[in-house]
Amino acid sequence: MKFSVLLPTRNGGAYLENCIRSILEQNYADMELVISDNANTDSTPQIVAMFTCDPRVKSLRIDQPVSVTDNWNNAFRASSGDYTLMMGDDDYMLPCCLERIEEILERNNQPDCIVYNAYSYVAPDSINGNAQSFYSDSHFRFGPDLRVERFIEPGERFEIVRNMFRFKVGIPLNMQTVLVGRKAADKIRGGLFQAPFPDHYALNSLLLTAERWVFSPEKLLVVGLSPKSFGHYVYSNQQGGGLAYLGIKDDFDGRLPGNVLLNGMHVWLNLLKQNYSELLQGVAVDRAGYVRRQVYSWFLQLRLGTITVGEFRRNFSLLSPSDFGGLLAAIVDRESWERLWHMLCSWNRSDAETQWRSLHSLNEVVDIRQFAQWLSHRGAVER
C-alpha cells in the first residue's frame, strides 16, 4: 500500500527542513514525498536540494507564484499513491505515523478516508508577536459520539455537513488530519481542491461522496502554526493579509466584516451546494448562524484591540432587523455561551490563549522538532 505525502510550500524555508525530516524518518518503505515549490524566494530551493537524492522525494517547481489551491492541486496531480496525506511546511509527522495509519486501514478493511487527531504547536512570534511557544494536546475537540475508533455512517456524515451550513464544525477542517483514498478523491466534482479554502471544500465533498469513513482518536502528527501560516493572519487579526496569502476574494451578498474564515466558509458552502445540489436538497447557508459567529468575532476583536469601539458600533449598523432576530437564538445556543465564557475567563491571559481554547504556554521549546521530542519525553515519563 503506497502513501503519497503532499507538501506544497510557499516561502516556508525556516520550517521546511524539520517537516521533511519528520516525513523521511518514517519507518515505512512504500511512500513518496511530493514537494511543490510555489516560486519560493527564500531558502526553500536549497533545503529541498538537500533531500532530492532520496528516491522517495519528488520535487516540483512553479516559476511564477500561484494560489494556495493551485499549488495543492499541483502536488496532488503529481502523486501516485493509493492514499494521500497533506502536510504544511510548518507541520511535523510523529514517529511511526504511517505505520499506525496502515494498521488502522488494515483493521477497517481499507476505508476511503480516515479522520484522526493531532497535537497543535504554535511557534514563537506566530500570534501578535508573542515570543512564547504554545501547544494543545488536542488539535480538535471531537464530540462525545466520536471517542473510539469506528466507522462514521453516511447519515452521521450528512449531519456533519448539514451542521457546517449552520457554521458548526464537527470534524477538523485540515487536510493534515484526514487520510484520503485516491479513488474517492478522483470522484470529487471539479477536482479535489477548490478555492477559497481547498481543504474545507475537499473534506465536505468527501463526507458526502466517499463510501466508507473511519474515525480514529489517535494523534499521529503535529499541526504547526508559524509566522508564515494562514493561521498567523487569522489569530493575529490581519484579515487582509490572510486573503492575500490564499490568493482569494471572499465577496458575497450580505457579507459582514469580521473573521475571514467565516466569510470564506460562506463562499465554499455555496460552492458545495451548487456542485452537490441533489445531495443537499433542503440545505442552505444559515444566515443566523453566520451572523452569530461574526458578532462573536467583533467582541473578540474589540477585546484584542484590533477594532475600535466606533468600528464595533458601526458593525452592528450593518445588521438587518431579521439579523437581530436571529441573534436571539444565541440565548439557547450552548456553543455561543461556551465561546463567551471562555473569552471572559481569558480576559487577563495572552491573546493566543484568549482565542484558542485548551492552549498552554511552553517554556524552553523554540521549534516543532523540539516539541515532538518534548512529547516523546513526556510520554516516557507518564508511562
Residue ranges and their predicted role:
Residues 1-238:
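Nucleotide-sugar donor-binding/catalytic module of glycosyltransferases
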